Amino acid sequence: MSKVKVNDTIEKNVISAYEMLHKHSICHGDVRSANIIVRDDDSVVLIDFERGLLNADKMMLIEEEDEVRHMMRAGRVIRS
């Protein structure tokens, strides 16, 4: 796997992926670039739900969303 720099499309897709989880009260539990796979078309796949939680409370989801946005703002590279 190679590393790619986060662009606007990837950032939007990562945030959307986490928002979809949170809409269903699912907390991923391990927000980090190693758990995000970027496809050639810049779509993303979240992996490693070992720490995931169903029916997460709202505060957990808000905190996780903040982590995701912080990671994206930092411009970290993610694997493809």
Predicted feature descriptions by range:
Residues 17-21:
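Conserved hydrophobic alpha-helix
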